[in-house]
UniProtKB/Swiss-Prot annotation:
Its main location: other. It comes from Bos taurus. This is Junctional cadherin 5-associated protein. Residues 595-604, 729-748 have a biased composition (Low complexity). The gene is JCAD. Residues 21-31, 69-82, 120-129, 140-151, 360-369, 878-889, 945-958, 1276-1288 have a biased composition (Basic and acidic residues).
Amino acid sequence: MYSVEDLLISHGYKLSRKLPAPHEDDGERRQPARTTVPAGPGLLNGCDDGPAALPRGKASPGTGLLSDPESRRLGPRGHGERPSTAAAARISEAGFYHQPVLAWSSQPLTGRSHAYWRRREQEAREDPGGRGPVPSLPTHPREGPWEVGGRSEHVMKKAVWEDELGMAGPARWQDVSVRSWNQPPRLGRQMSDGVGEKLFQDLYPFMLGEHGLTSQSKGKSQSLPRVLSPESLSCMEVPIPLSDGHLPGVPKVPLQPPNCASNLESTRNPKKAGTSAPLPQPRFGRPLKPPSYGSQPHSKAGAENGSYTDSRQLDPGAAHSARTNSARQDLYGPDPGLEPPVYVPPPSYKSPPQPAAHPCPEEAVSRHEGRGRRVPQHPMERPAAGGQPLSGSRGAGSEWGASPCSPVGVPPQPHHTTAYDGSILIIPFDDPRIRHIKLPRPHGFWEDVKLDGAVPAPDPRSLQQEGAVWGPSGKERGPAPADPSPSWLWGQPPRNGENGSSPDQRDPCIVTQRKQPDVSGSPQEYPESLVSSPSPQGESSCEMQTQLRKFEAGLQPKRSSKKKTSETIFCLVSIPVKSESQLPGTDTNNNDLKQSASLQEQSVLSLSSTDLELQALTGSMATRTELPRPDPGGPGRGRQADDLRFPSPAKHRALAWPGPWPGHHFRDQQTQTSFAHEPQSLQPLPGERPGGSPDPVLPPRCLDPAPFEVQMHMALASSDPNQRPGAHSPKSQGSLSPSSNSAFSGSSWPRNQGPVPRASLGQQGSDGPGRRASPVSRGEVIKGETTGPCNSRQLFGQFLLKPVSRRPWDLISQLESFNKELQEEEGSSGSSSDGSGSEDSDTELPWGSCARPAPQLPGLLKDIVPEDPRTRPGRVKSKSESWSEEGRPRSPRPWQAEGRGSVWLSPPGSWIAEDGDREVEDRVAQLAVSPRPVKRAISSGLNDAKPEPPPDPAEQREPLPSQELPGSRGAVELSAAGPPRAGGGEQGSTRAPLSLAGKSRGLSAPDLRSVGLTLVQEHSTSQLAGSPGDANAIEIPPNESLEARAARILGIEVAVESLLPGAQRAGQRRHPEPDGSALRPESPRQEAAASLAQPNESTAPADAFYGRRKCGWTKSPLFVGERDSTRQVPRASEPADVDGAVPTKAPETPPSPLESQPFLPKDVETKPPFRSTLFHFIERTPNLAFSEKKLRNTSRVIESLQEKLVSPPRKADPDRLTRMKEVSSVSRMRLLTSRAADSAEEPKAERGPGAWLGGLVAPSAGHKLSDPQGALSLEADGHPAARRENGGRDFWCPDSYDPSRVERV
């Protein structure tokens, strides 16, 4: 694990200078234990005092610092010895560390406020040994980290309180120190040391970021912990106490202190606020926490755990928040380095640790405290309280509402907080996540929500709600009504208070709240309407609420670290509610989202506390996109996403809100397990899907990536909205565009449900261009895809939530890690931006949205203009165009075929080039993903003619690649993926479109990603290498890319075997049609399989297969047959393609690669257009004409998905492998046999090869349009017919041979 110091440093924290006085004070005794950690750095946040104070404060330093975990664990034991002796002496030694923290925390903060505490702190400092009264003893057991950091912070707090309360320092200090101070800090710390320690141990991995600091500070990483201990320990210790203490039943009292602190702080808000800023930092001479956290904008502190770390380090109690803030400002004024500029600790360290119950309670406390106190100190206090909510708020709660005994009205709050703590526990985890959501467009939104008038009420109400909302795990509901903007019943109150105060962003407790405000619509879940008012769409508020719910639902479970992890996932789920950012931009979705908001509100009101809790966890997503709730089932695993698109959003909504499935409230929200139900409900979504369905489509797969993607999307919100609102805005792309489309669709369900992104992209394209171009295409696309992604985005978090509770955790973990990686990958590559349904979009949108949203291909943009990002590389259209253009240019086959990728370009050549480039890049991207894709890309490149036209579009679009960040990256990756395709490089470009048509269809996530990256690569390659061959050569390093790119594209480590099967199959099927048939389907399938299967291995193969059919599901025969058929048709009937792929890997017959290439270019050239046209047409048709197939197939897919979820991950893999081999040979024979027989029948059914042939050939320079068309038509049509005969029907059987599944296998 990373040491605290490492973590802090890596996160931008400068280890603060040593705590001068307290550390020196304690340093004498603690220096040895704290040797590794400089006294100053250790005390940096006054937390090192925690680690150092333990040694110093404990007779046995080992027990103190090293025993910090023990102290926390043994709390009573370790502290027991220390409380009277070590605590008294150490506190004295540490000055105020040990005792002050305790006294501070213990004190009810009523009578003995500052004077007493100041006195106590003075005594503690002056009387190293005399000051450890027995009262300190109870506290000391948990004082380990807390005492160290807490004492310092408490000293600071005492100073603050002394100043604030003007109490007789000595009297209050001594009395409280002995009795109240010690106990409350102990409560806060007790939580930390006793149950907190246990929890800490459980959550240690999660708390690694800052909680890890505590743990290390406890003596695991003494050096780092000490260095970080002051900063991170205190901050961390506080959260750990809250997290550990609050999490466990025992620390509930500490929660109470935080709550009490909240109350007290609320009561003393003026004092606290006033004193916080002017905290007497020099008094204790310990720069507990640099004021930077407090000083730093709440957004930073609130969002970053660094802030929390500082907060924790800074102050174990609320006093810490106020006192530390001012003290930090004063004491740590010079220590701003300690806090990172915008420290958003990685969710992995921060999320779970922060999920300590405290963050929320502390947040609430800090929030509540900060309402009065924090508002004045808003920038700093909020960061301190938000940044150090665990330590500050929790510390504040622990110290202010210091002790469970603290009579200040802590009892109610402690209870609430305690209950809430479990809920809150997740918040720290969310904090980084929240930061993610917060970052995109939350500031305005949550500020809006916050400024909603939430500020005034939250103070008192927040205090109460802290007790009420925070207290009850599901209390958020109760408080929510009280809140002016009770979007988050329990998250909202703080949110209101902090919204106004802008603490939301930094409130760990409000992580959810913060998220909520972040999204302004974030409260969407509960306050969809509430938040909706601040933010038109109620944005992703529900995400935030989801986190709150998560906290609540998982907060009790959070007591168990394991549950907390689940909750963490929930957190992830919550964050993606990005609708907020794009919600405003997309009116079409706004309606749906608003409906969701109202539904959310109703649901919140009607649901019971537990239900509300669940709703917050799952319902917020559902509320945000009622469709999304069912959608999780639909896209579940990325397959139902497609279905979700088609089902009517109303149906979705009905399913989602009422939780039509018996236990599916969460299931729906975490849609991953309720696939069959959802798809059914989702299937009706053709028209309604605009608002609700898209969201559902995405979430299933976007479990973990949601936060990242959401963040990405939020960042891309501006561009994404261009794409989304422009492209999807009319439809439900708005919903998609807000957050789902970008993060969920692009990263989550595109990779999760490859076909869905296709559909989504297609729908996006259709929504934007398709819609515009042809109502049918647009309706089709829109019906499922655009809306699907839209809702999916919103639903992303929801699904994460559900998977946590409903789905197998391993699947969730897989999905999480996969999605995370994928999102990170896609986010990096901009893949996540347009996750709406096209990998192009996904990959391109982040880059395209951000880098080149508008500068996309003008021609492409013409119709796709609204979906700028989607148009981003023109191959955004390759998927989206495929779908939308398919329907739109249905009349003009050339348009259709070319328009699929480049139909938007007016010139057929340009279209083809555009399409070819797009598809080639898509293909190349997938090629890079796997040898099979590479071969497919090469095969695609085989068409010289095709690359020729594409160069124009490529160059036309080259600006797009250039503009699109993925352009260079794509070019590079294409280069990486291109080498194998070097021989057929040009053909790769050409072929790729063909493959892309099916592949981007077939593989939403990989394709999107590949396309996003490879498209630009291909474009760049195509353009950079004037000759398509050259471009392909550039983009051909699929071998290198295979794993690397697969990992990048999929965002998850893909087994080489998974990719290699693609290579093998590419080899196997290359001879027939390696690129279009084997490569494209295989690569997408493999990519989708890898992307889908890896996230949910049980559904992995099917997921890849079905995800590929996400769009294809709509056109189940098409997708299955065409994709599979095309794959195998080219295999069996396209040796030329193989030849084209020969350069890469044409295992079958490289008769004459050059000869084949010229022929194949025609063939492929012809084939890609025809295929694009027919295939996409079919794909669209499944949406419309083939809706029955789509529905039936979708049902099958959903069933299969459900089976897979239920059944072992790779149950069918052996079958599939065997069947794959069988079907491969059979399908080759059948392809050869049925190529001619089924050619007429298949073109329509398959519409892939034939469409590509006709559409692409004609636009392509008509390379043997008739001949290739006939050949490909037979090949594609006859083969697809045979294929569908052979595999199409089979494919629908999850265990049936599924090229995509086979690929995956």
